[in-house]
Amino acid sequence: MAQVINTNYLSLVTQNNLNKSQGTLGSAIERLSSGLRINSAKDDAAGQAIANRFTSNVNGLTQASRNANDGISIAQTTEGALNEINNNLQRIRELTVQAKNGTNSNSDITSIQNEVKNVLDEINRISEQTQFNGVKVLSGEKSEMVIQVGTNDNETIKFNLDKVDNDTLGVASDKLFDTKTEKKGVTAAGAGVTDAKKINAAATLDMMVSLVKEFNLDGKPVTDKFIVTKGGKDYVATKSDFELDATGTKLGLKASATTEFKVDAGKDVKTLNVKDDALATLDKAINTIDESRSKLGAIQNRFESTINNLNNTVNNLSASRSRILDADYATEVSNMSRGQILQQAGTSVLAQANQVPQTVLSLLR
């Protein structure tokens, strides 16, 4: 090797190696400080792209798991409301069984109906006011709930939010109770009439005979009765016998007293009765609630299974991403130690290399 002054080759080689060791030391320190093997695309371009996709999936699946938990929450909220409606229906059924007992007076049944009406109003209130995050779950406002449980389009779970109220359950008050209006009937007055009249073409007596069906006097039913109107007064015969021939007509009221009466139309009596199929109607409504609750229970189990699967997937993807992205501290500490040693050695050697041109000066002495 020529002895020169302007170019110190050994110093240049030493500086180059010192730069390399410094880069190695800097990279090791960066990885140790960040905990990542890939801090920029230059560290591993392909690995960085793969890790980024894994990050996207992990973040999406984590959110999907939270979505599924929200689905469980809304199903639990809905089921809780249905449970309360079921309790109300059970109370109505109990009251209906009580109302069907023959020992109840009309006022007793009216009192029972009043309580039933209040319970039915509560069912409608629950239907209208039960909500989750502003969504009314039983009013029919939103018939279908869609929960995103994946990281891609159409990865959803759907379940129905059925409208539940008195009308849809078929338990409105008029479906359980029946109001009947009973006529008080007639008010009897006057005495019996026993005479008979002859009727012919020249008669000036006006009579009207009218058949009455189901006349009830003093609580005793009679049949085949006639009203005879004469001079503005009405007479009733329980039996009658008429003869018609070519020359004239005889009207006979045989073996029966007649009675003057008037109709009292202003005093109708209303009776309240439980419908014959009221209990069957309530059983059908309770079965409807049971079916809805079973569906919500099934969807909750499905969401729990989905959450478990999502969490497992997140764990596996996170582990895969870690193997690509995260720094191995054992390796990086070793690299840092090696870099530090090379830096110290390089600095010392560079000092020695810089002294080489000094040997040329000895030739000038």
UniProtKB/Swiss-Prot annotation:
Induction details: Although swimmer cells have only a few flagella, the elongated swarmer cells are profusely covered by thousands of new flagella synthesized specifically in response to growth on surfaces or in highly viscous liquids.
A GO MF annotation of the entry reads: structural molecule activity
Per the record's keyword annotation, is Ribonucleoprotein included, yes or no?
no
> What are its GO cellular component terms?
bacterial-type flagellum; extracellular region
The name this protein carries in UniProt is: Flagellin 1
- Chief subcellular location: secreted
Keyword Amino-acid biosynthesis listed? The answer is: no
| Role summary | Flagellin is the subunit protein which polymerizes to form the filaments of bacterial flagella.
Q: Which domain of life is it from?
A: Bacteria
Query: Cross-referenced Gene3D superfamilies, in alphabetical order?
Result: 2.60.40.4390, 6.10.280.190, f41 fragment of flagellin, N-terminal domain, Flagellar export chaperone, C-terminal domain
Q: Which family does it belong to?
A: Belongs to the bacterial flagellin family.
As for subcellular location, the record says: Secreted; Bacterial flagellum
**Keyword entries, A-Z:** Bacterial flagellum, Secreted
Q: Which SUPFAM superfamilies is this protein grouped with?
A: Phase 1 flagellin
